[in-house]
Every structure is written in C-alpha cells, then in structure tokens.
C-alpha cells in the first residue's frame, strides 16, 4: 500500500452542490433562496428579531469603566518567603519591580505592585518563617503596602524604602 494509491470509497465523500449554474442543475437562478425578500438578497443582521425591539436594546444600560481604577500586581509575603526558601533572594536584597520581573513574579510590568501580609485565617507564618525573614534584612521598594504588611515589615526589622 502506498499513499499515491489510496482513494475514497464510492459515496464516502460527497461534493458540495454548485449553485447558480443554470436551471438544470437544481440550484440555479435563485440558488435555493426562494424569490424576493430580505433573506434572498443578503443575510439578516446579527441580533435582528424581525422588527421586534432587539434584546440588547430592551435591557437597561449597566455599569461603566472607572477612569480612576488602580491596577495592582498583588504580591503576598508568602510568595517572597517561597523565593527566599528557593534561594532566589539573597541577604540584604532590595525587593522591587525589577527583581520581581526578573523572577517572573509579575503579570504586567505597567501595573503598580502591592505587598500584602499573610491572611491570618488561611496563610499563617510560622516562627521559623518569621525568623528567616528577619535574618535576611530585606528592603522593600514597592508602590503600595497593606497596613498589616507595612506594620509587620517594620516590626521585624526590615526596611520600607519608599512611602
């Protein structure tokens, strides 16, 4: 068996009907669209409901896009801790946008970065984790900090460079 000798069985592949090729073809003249009218001339517009007010116009307008919305890349202290444990952040490092981009921790570089402290109900920092963070003497140079993040960073002896 060779590729150039293969062929379809009879009736396996049906050719499409060629329209507009004369009355004898079975789909000539009006090409199966019938005589006159909107659907014979062109397609009906998307959303057109036959003269009835379309659904999109019947529904009320809702919401808007705020011009003053702040887009943040959210970084949690747990993420920083994981990077420290993986030896990607060394002693005395300045954690800023460039470092986080280099480590591929940010989705978009245009957004501001906000540091959050671990949520006490779900992500609890152990005493080992806290001692590890204090030994490293990290410095944070980010755009925003949650209130608890700023408070705990200063409490643990790390530095907040800006703000």
Swiss-Prot record:
Keywords, in A-Z order: Ribonucleoprotein, Ribosomal protein, RNA-binding, rRNA-binding
Subunit and interaction comment: Part of the 50S ribosomal subunit.
Protein name: Large ribosomal subunit protein uL15
Gene Ontology CC terms: cytosolic large ribosomal subunit
Entry's family note: Belongs to the universal ribosomal protein uL15 family.
Transmembrane segments: none
SUPFAM superfamilies: Ribosomal proteins L15p and L18e
Organism the protein comes from: Orientia tsutsugamushi (strain Boryong)
Keyword Protein transport: no
Matching PANTHER family: 50S RIBOSOMAL PROTEIN L15 (PTHR12934), LARGE RIBOSOMAL SUBUNIT PROTEIN UL15M (PTHR12934:SF11)
Function description: Binds to the 23S rRNA.
One MF term in the entry's GO annotations: structural constituent of ribosome
Gene Ontology biological-process entries: translation
NCBIfam families reported in the protein's UniProt record: rplO_bact
